[in-house]
Structure formats: C-alpha cells, structure tokens
Amino acid sequence: MQDLIKRTLPQDDALNQAIVNDLRSQNWAGFLNYSQVQQLCHNFELTTLKLAMHLLPLAASYSHTAISHFNVGAIAIGEQGDFYFGANQEFANSAIQQTIHAEQSAISHAWLRNERRISDMVVNYTPCGHCRQFMNELHGAEKISIHLPHSQNNPLHSYLPDAFGPKDLDIAAHLLAEENHDLVADHQDDLVNQAILAANQSHCPYSNSPHGIAILFKNSDVVTGRYAENAAFNPSLPALQTALNFAYLNDKKLSDIERIVMAEKALKLSHKTMAETLLSTLTSVELEYYSL
C-alpha cells in the first residue's frame, strides 16, 4: 500500500509529502481527522473541498477492482470535519452483488469509526443510482452535499428526486444514528462478544435481523463489521462487506486472517450462506457462526 500511495501522490510535491507523512504515522489508514485536515489546509492555502478533491486519486488507490479495473474514490466528510476515505471493492469468482461501491465504502468506514452524520460526499465519478439510494438512508440525508470534479455543492436530492426512503415504510431509524438491539455479549470467547456487539449496532429496521462480524488477524488486531440495511433492500450492505472494507482501508492483508466470527439474530433473513460463499473465494479460514 505504501508504494502504491507514493506512486499515486508524486513525492516531488510538498503537499503530497505532507499527506504521505500523515498516513505513514497511522500505518496507512485511509482517514484524516479534523486536525490533520485543518493543518494541511492552513499550510497549503487550500479549502477543505479542494483538499478533498486532491485526495480522490489517493482514496481510489484503496480499490480492489479485479472485475472492472475501474477505480472509484470517495471521501465522506463528517460533521466535525473528519475525512473518511472510500473505494470500490470487487470480489472476483463471486456474485457481482457482493460488490461494495465507493460511496458505500466511505460511509461504512465512517460508521465503523462511530461517525454520526455525513455533511458532504466527494467522489470522482457521478454516483450511480445504487449509491444515491444508499445515501438516502443516512441520518441527515436531506442536508448532504455531493461534490464532483466537474460540479460541486449539489444536494443529494437533486440526484434522487421524489425519493423513496425510510419514511415511506414508516421507519424513523436512519443509518449512522445510534442503534441498540438489546443483544447481550456474555460469551466466554472475546471474539464472539465483539461480533455480538457489532450486531447490536446494526441498522436493520426492515428485517429486524441484525448480524455482526469480527475478524481476528495474526497480529491480534480485530476488525468488526455491522449490517447496514436499506429501505430499497438491494443496496443493503452485509456485515462481512463492512468488515472487509474497513480492513482494506486500514491496510490489512486478508492472508493474515486467523479467525472470522459471525453473530446473527436471523428473524426474517440470514446472511450466513452469502458470507460463507464470499469467504470461500478469499481465504481458507472458515466462518464461525453463532445464532443469537
């Protein structure tokens, strides 16, 4: 990842050097906090939006695009000004529906860092209909601005007029808002407990079937994922995808996975088979499943 980032940001430029130094200090995690953003903007006389635009090729470098070879980068800006990178993640030898779109990637990245509201989405290509619908699930969706290289300051709803969303199904819950499904993490195995805690933070008001993922890496790091459901159903993002996406954006290698646990309360649907199918194309590590 380090070499790819340096190729993406030529190091004969002072701004790029400063960005690389920030990323190196955090082990190449695709994230810049508010203080880092403000320091870069101050030192190089940039607006927040101009910095985000400059970072789009860097965000896109976190992509895995074995199918399309078309890298999309996105940056979700949180309400306090943090930058969350996102990139499209494709999975060869599996169903195309397993794909993570760049905007989904950035939003789920923000969610797993406990962001509560996205104010802006900066992306290098016009959002597809799938992503427009996914963003419409967000807390504060009516206030989100979309910024493209050729067109800035566009309200999300200008891309999705007469939108269908949670309110049409009489649902008050929104993605990124605090969630609690009263799941108790009291297992003797800590990794199982982390999967349960992730499931407890799922956004699943349509099926009421939360599930979470916990991945243990060989260096003892743990990455978790939560289920993000959508009013339109198909743009929903399973917990395995949010976990894998977070791993990719934090420069984790899937070859270093030691264990993978899923905890699920399968009331109306289950993601167990879908997760096992995807994992079989990525690793020899088998899914450990716990029904709640």
From Swiss-Prot:
Its recorded reaction(s) are: cytidine + H2O + H(+) = uridine + NH4(+); 2'-deoxycytidine + H2O + H(+) = 2'-deoxyuridine + NH4(+)
Q: Which domain of life is it from?
A: Bacteria
Q: Which InterPro entries match?
A: APOBEC/CMP_deaminase_Zn-bd (IPR016192), CMP_dCMP_dom (IPR002125), Cyd/dCyd_deaminase_Zn-bd (IPR013171), Cyt/Deoxycyt_deaminase (IPR050202), Cyt_deam_dimer (IPR006263), Cytidine_deaminase-like (IPR016193), Cytidine_deaminase_bacteria (IPR020797)
Q: What's an example Gene Ontology biological process for this entry?
A: cytidine deamination
Which metal ions or organic cofactors does this protein require, according to UniProt? Zn(2+)
- Is Hydrolase given among the entry's keywords? yes
Cofactor comment: Binds 1 zinc ion.
**What UniProt keywords apply to this chain's record, in alphabetical order?**
Hydrolase, Metal-binding, Zinc
Query: Active-site residues?
Result: E103 (proton donor)
**Cellular component terms (Gene Ontology):** cytosol
Q: What is its EC number?
A: 3.5.4.5
Binding sites annotated in the UniProt record for substrate: N88, Q89, E90
Q: Where along the chain is Zn(2+) bound?
A: H101, C128, C131
Xref: PROSITE patterns: CYT_DCMP_DEAMINASES_1 (PS00903), CYT_DCMP_DEAMINASES_2 (PS51747)
Cross-referenced HAMAP family, in alphabetical order?
Cyt_deam (MF_01558)
User: Which PANTHER family does the entry mention?
Assistant: CYTIDINE DEAMINASE
Q: Which family does it belong to?
A: Belongs to the cytidine and deoxycytidylate deaminase family.
What exactly does this protein do?
This enzyme scavenges exogenous and endogenous cytidine and 2'-deoxycytidine for UMP synthesis.
**Quaternary structure?**
Homodimer.
What is this protein's name? Answer: Cytidine deaminase
- Gene, per the UniProt record: cdd
